[in-house]
């Protein structure tokens, strides 16, 4: 009997996280990502590398997201539905690519441990280093902060430009002791990083129960104790106010979120947004301005945009 069924979606770099979420919602217990773009970049940038590309067989183009499922899961029936959802990402401005879906049986040893040899600590910003949970790591300089994560989980492990942009914005605005709401927390990486950087109480929300469980698992791997994770749809029903509100989600989800943020953000607070494809930035900025915000910072990387929005000062 085979230990796992692997469902592979052929897609594009920009759709990786969205496809990962689709597979997790379908019941995947683990996610593997193969992205040709990782091997087109320099192997070591200013902040190091998460894995050793020289040792990894890799794609020449495009990307593959592989979900690992219990063999008892009926994927033959789900395959067409998953393909339809992936193709539907186009309506959110994401290129789904070929959106082909294939199935294969694999043994436990083929994926559960072998892939770990390729993952190493990754310096993602001035102060933050992401470390896979099985690695022992000693900080390399004063002030360096370690974020321990399980990169086998979906919902963001720090390698995507949107996550790194958001982490750099957090470093730029945190002064210590703030309250924060993390909308669409995913892996919990932003909440964990924020507390490590000095934020006080943090409420992390996600509409997906699987993401909530993943965030809780990652939080337990880190020396943090002021993060509460709940399942919730954006800010609906949230009554508390915060100094920082962060959201690394698709532009189409940011648009309805923006009006919800204004009454929840304290005066002189910061609303940090990422997950914005460059061609959607104008839409998001216009929506922010229409809701009483101005742009304090704009950062870009890899075709993605992150924004630091503040409440407009009145004359």
Curated annotation (Swiss-Prot):
- UniProt EC number: 2.1.1.-
**For S-adenosyl-L-methionine, which residues are the binding ones?**
163, 184, 206, 248
The entry lists its GO molecular-function terms as: protein-lysine N-methyltransferase activity
Q: Does the keyword Mitochondrion apply?
A: no
Q: Name one GO cellular component term.
A: cytoplasm
Query: Where can this protein be found?
Result: Cytoplasm
Tell me the InterPro entries matching this sequence: Ribosomal_L11_MeTrfase_PrmA, Ribosomal_PrmA_MeTrfase, SAM-dependent_MTases_sf
Which protein are we looking at?
Ribosomal protein L11 methyltransferase
**Organism (species):** Lacticaseibacillus paracasei (strain ATCC 334 / BCRC 17002 / CCUG 31169 / CIP 107868 / KCTC 3260 / NRRL B-441) (Lactobacillus paracasei)
């Amino acid at each position: 009997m085979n230990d796992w069924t692997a469902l592979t979606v052929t897609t594009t770099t920009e759709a990786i996280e969205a496809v990962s979420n689709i597979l997790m919602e379908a019941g995947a217990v683990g996610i593997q990502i193969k992205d040709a773009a990782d091997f087109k970049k320099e192997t070591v940038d200013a902040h190091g590398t998460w894995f050793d590309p020289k040792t990894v067989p890799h794609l020449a183009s495009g990307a593959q997201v592989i979900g690992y499922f219990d063999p008892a899961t009926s994927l033959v029936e789900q395959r067409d539905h998953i393909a339809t959802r992936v193709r539907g990402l186009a309506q959110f401005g994401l290129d789904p690519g070929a959106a082909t879906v294939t199935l294969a049986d694999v043994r436990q040893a083929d994926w559960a441990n072998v892939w770990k040899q390729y993952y190493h600590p990754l310096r993602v910003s001035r102060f933050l280093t992401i470390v896979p949970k099985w690695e022992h790591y000693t900080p390399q300089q004063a002030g360096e902060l370690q974020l321990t994560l399980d990169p086998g989980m979906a919902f963001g492990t720090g390698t995507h430009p949107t996550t790194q942009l958001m982490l750099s914005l957090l470093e730029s605005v945190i002064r210590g002791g703030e309250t924060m709401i993390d909308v669409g927390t995913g892996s919990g990486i932003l909440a964990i990083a924020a507390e490590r950087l000095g934020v006080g109480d943090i409420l992390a929300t996600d509409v997906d129960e699987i993401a909530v469980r993943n965030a809780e698992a990652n939080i337990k791997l880190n020396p943090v104790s002021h993060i509460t994770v709940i399942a919730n749809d954006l800010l609906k029903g949230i009554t508390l106010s915060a100094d920082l509100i962060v959201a690394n989600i698709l532009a189409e989800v940011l648009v309805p979120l923006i009006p919800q943020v204004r009454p929840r953000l304290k005066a002189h607070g910061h609303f940090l947004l990422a997950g914005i494809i460059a061609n959607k930035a104008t839409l998001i900025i216009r929506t922010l301005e229409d809701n009483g915000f101005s742009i304090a910072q704009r950062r870009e990387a890899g075709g993605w945009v992150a924004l630091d929005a503040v409440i407009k000062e009145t004359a």
